[in-house]
């Protein structure tokens, strides 16, 4: 049976979930990956209000939608980051506080623990959930990084300096992961520039830093790997059991006018000079056929969650065509050898 196709609501948080849900259904999706900003999934309210999660499910069911994950990228970013004025725009006021770096980090850490508890409560309330269902809930997100600014290794950067960054990540995230463990929730880091893991090598190093904590894995997204030159299909095979969730998202590279490189040239997305940019699914350079084959090989059975971004295209048009693209692309794996019928018993 093909995997459910869902839409990540993070880029749609200007709409209430009540406004967005019928649009998601009309675009052809089976469900949503709920962002923890806007009013889509408010973690504090989920814990404080007795009927909050039930009402969310009622709204989704009204429009024939399900949910398989929630995502709190924005708060997670602040756990390890070197905080500056940009963070104020993406953080809840109670996390930002006075903007002092260590205070922001600590409040972000507590909010991620709250996210785990809220996610567990939400998925426990899923309509039709069997009492014997002990499957982990999924929270996707970012970690931030105290060493991203050293990615180019100048001033000269030795491994001891980088080790300190991975140690800082472990110190801040292991206590969070312990709450995830207590709540039976998996945390899926979206491997992405600005995070502690942004390619295959750094993903291995991040896993090692948290001693392969069972609750730490990945939200696979090829769009953040391809333009870097990372083998995005190998990532699937390298981390198969740690891929808890994924984003279907496209990107092209090798474009532009030659004046802007892989670092972006301090240009905006959709600037025609850019070397790379995110595209609607099927319009970029990611080989999704190879991705589906690899996902079948590792027996990934979770949703195919479309994270739609394309600065050149209307989002309703783009998200609709992306849903159609994913549905045509996905297929169930073969359950028997194709040549089995040749043999006599």
PLM regions and their residue ranges:
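Boundary/entry segment of secreted carbohydrate-active catalytic domains
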Residues: 1-15
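Acidic/histidine-rich catalytic cores of soluble enzymes
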Residues: 4-5, 31-32, 70, 153-285, ...
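Active-site-proximal loop/turn and secondary-structure-junction residues that shape catalytic pockets
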Residues: 11-13, 36-38, 73-76, 143-147, ...
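Active-site acidic/histidine proton-transfer and metal-coordination neighborhood
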Residues: 14, 19, 23, 62, ...
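A structural motif
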Residues: 29, 34, 65, 122-127, ...
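Conserved beta-strand positions in the central sheet of alpha/beta enzyme cores
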Residues: 33, 69-71, 128, 140, ...
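Glycine-rich, proline-tolerant flexible connector loops at the mouths of alpha/beta enzymes
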Residues: 35-57, 61, 143-148
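C-terminal helical cap(s) of enzyme catalytic domains, especially alpha/beta-barrels
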Residues: 315-335
């Amino acid at each position: 049976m093909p995997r459910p196709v869902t839409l990540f609501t993070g880029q749609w948080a200007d709409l209430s979930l009540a406004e967005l849900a019928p649009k998601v259904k009309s675009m052809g999706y089976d469900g949503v990956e709920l962002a923890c900003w806007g009013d889509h999934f408010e973690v504090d309210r989920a814990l404080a209000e007795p009927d909050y999660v039930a009402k969310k499910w009622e709204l989704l069911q009204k429009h024939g939608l399900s949910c398989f994950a929630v995502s709190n990228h924005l708060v997670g970013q602040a756990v390890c980051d070197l905080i500056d004025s940009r963070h104020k725009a993406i953080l809840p006021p109670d996390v930002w506080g006075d903007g002092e770096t260590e205070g922001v980090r600590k409040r972000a850490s507590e909010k991620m623990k709250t996210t785990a508890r809220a996610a567990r409560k939400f998925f426990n309330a899923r309509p039709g959930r069997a009492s014997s269902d002990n499957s982990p809930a999924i929270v996707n997100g970012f970690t931030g990084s105290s060493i991203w600014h050293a990615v180019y290794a100048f001033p000269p950067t030795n491994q001891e300096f980088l080790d300190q960054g991975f140690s800082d990540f472990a110190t801040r995230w292991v206590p969070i992961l312990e709450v995830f463990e207590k709540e039976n929730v998996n945390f899926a880091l979206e491997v992405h520039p600005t995070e502690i893991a942004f390619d295959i090598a750094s993903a291995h190093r991040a896993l090692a830093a948290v001693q392969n904590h069972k609750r730490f894995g990945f939200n696979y997204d090829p769009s953040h790997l391809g333009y870097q030159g990372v083998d995005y299909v190998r990532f699937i095979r390298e981390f198969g059991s740690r891929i808890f969730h994924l984003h279907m998202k496209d990107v092209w590279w090798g474009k532009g006018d030659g004046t802007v490189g892989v670092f972006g040239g301090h240009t905006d997305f959709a600037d025609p000079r850019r070397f790379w940019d995110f595209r609607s699914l099927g319009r970029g350079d990611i080989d999704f056929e190879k991705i589906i084959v690899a996902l079948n090989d590792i027996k990934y059975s979770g949703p195919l969650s479309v994270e739609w971004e394309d600065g050149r295209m209307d989002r309703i048009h783009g998200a609709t065509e992306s849903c159609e693209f994913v549905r045509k692309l996905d297929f169930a794996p073969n359950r028997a050898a194709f040549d089995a019928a040749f043999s006599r018993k």
